[in-house]
């Protein structure tokens, strides 16, 4: 893992109005003047509603590969049984047969739902080279070699007049593995699959004749109304003329965005202009160079052609936005979530816009039993008055958790009475202020505009809201629930979230933020204070560091404060304790870390934290336990000598803290608290809990996951009997493998009882929750900077921090 990725992980650990359809929003965003362009997220109204209609695929279609919309028709590729059979001999010597499949193109009528195969499409190219597809040649030993071919359509795109473009690759190979010719083609088909023209990608023209096996990849194909074709492979944009000839290309430093289309006549890339604003930069085939630049939203990394109302569309945070032609304002056009559609199930390359305003997408959903299905979704605008209204409950968040988004969709679809309407304040972030949305939310709450529910991703000041009396105690709801009583939940994470015995937020899942050390170094300490850490460090060779050498003062300060927040702040009584020996000791602990890591002078090869621990170069590894797979890997990587000692704390308590992907709150002003609890309790359903990546908060799901993780499967023969190794022992089956950095791949097997007991001991001993109030962290970082730079004493810094945080607390009352 690189330092930048590692730093990102550190930050993540730390910072750890509609009817039944989508609404049409007001126009109050981007300024048309590029110099004054802003990107505040739009508010929504219920002037229009979009209603989803799903179409199931025909039974013989196993999987949609790639798709596009040309005109008002959806085209897609799929693998279907072709009536053939193949056989192979398995490891036991038994002959096994299976059906063969062919790749087919379908045309889907979005008005009738009729799905038609393009019978005129020829699935393989005509190959004259006998060494190529389905050819025959002589091997070096004089034997005859028969080459078979495999053709795959990698991507497709709309063309002019209802046609479609495909990029397909055909590879040939002999039974002995000898590689034949590889053929790449851009082909244009009419609505029935008849071949109109073929273009050979420019890479093939320059292919090394001694290397006949080539794999060309094209991510994007676009065409304009003059017949020019544009391709993009993440490195180069190539442009071809109406006659198929190569025109020009752009690559390297000239490309810093995504190939996309603004209109039928304008193809180009999204890029940053000289003044740092986002623009659409047109490719001009006539001049063979860049053409005009059009200002676009700073959130529009990939755009789609507009219609009679909008200049272009783009997606952001699970919604579709558009820039209005009449005002130049960017507004939210469709909120997938408000349409009861989970945007997690839709790929950006598998949806499009029809001329009549409908939106079409291919959806993918998986189930907990391992099954999956695809459907075709059509969103049609409807009169809002015709939609049966429900009680709407506003849920505020700052970035919506992936799994929670799916659960909201499920709840909204199934509930006859309630609808959760999400307002994601991360949409208000600007290039200059990432936390602008949090500021807006706090301002609205202070002014009395309080949401019904809050979903916290460890970045919102929940304890502050609770101290203001804005949040409901959730224990009475749990105690009164007929199914989810306290003893049905993992109580330790909940108890750590309590304030004076009240539970103001309920986590949907949990993990444990901790620091790992080797038992041979960190065992034997009754406490784990800063002095204990320094004592343990003295046991290691000279030059060893407490944590990874890349961590800076700023990173470690935020880490330590977030892990120790409950030791220094009490929102309920409005006090803080930064002018203390304990906090000064924390500052002194942070000071030896570098202000900035000197990458230029570092010539050493990267070593993972696990390697540094085992080599005596590092005392502790900050990480989080999220699942039993994490647990198994940690023990295996450290030769079963892992100890979860956590971060140093001066009060003698454990240095571990719980975290969660999302915690849920009900506000005291909620318009329907029974409905709000109905939604929260839906996140406790066993199917949802068992699908989470983190540890479930539902005890039965946690225990079921533990049982599954501790159950070892073994290799068996066709009769179900265990296969034994040379020593007469059954052969365990790995559930997968994990590798970090320079560490070798470690196969994952069943968690042992000892490992299970270790994680339970960590959970049972943890008493705090990672608490991040970004405003407090900013104050501490600002005032600690002088001490860390040597211009202030630790006493001066702690007094300034105490004064400013105290004032901040009083201001928030």
Stretches with model-predicted labels:
Residues 23-26, 30-106, 110-115, 156, ...:
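Conserved N-terminal structural module of periplasmic/extracytoplasmic solute-binding proteins
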Residues 726-805:
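C-terminal capping/gating helix-and-loop segments adjacent to ligand/active sites or protein-protein/ligand interfaces
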Residues 419-489, 498, 612-620, 636-637:
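Extracytoplasmic "Venus flytrap"/periplasmic binding protein-like
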Residues 588, 593-678, 700, 704:
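Extracytoplasmic/periplasmic substrate-binding proteins
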Residues 459-514, 526-532, 642-648:
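Hinge/lid segment of periplasmic solute-binding proteins
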Residues 109, 190-192, 196, 498-604, ...:
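Helix-loop-helix "hinge/cap" segment bordering the ligand-binding cleft or interdomain interface
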Residues 475-488, 566-587, 646-657, 790:
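Short, solvent-exposed loop/beta-turn-alpha elements that line the ligand-binding surface or hinge
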Residues 542, 681-711:
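Periplasmic-binding protein-like
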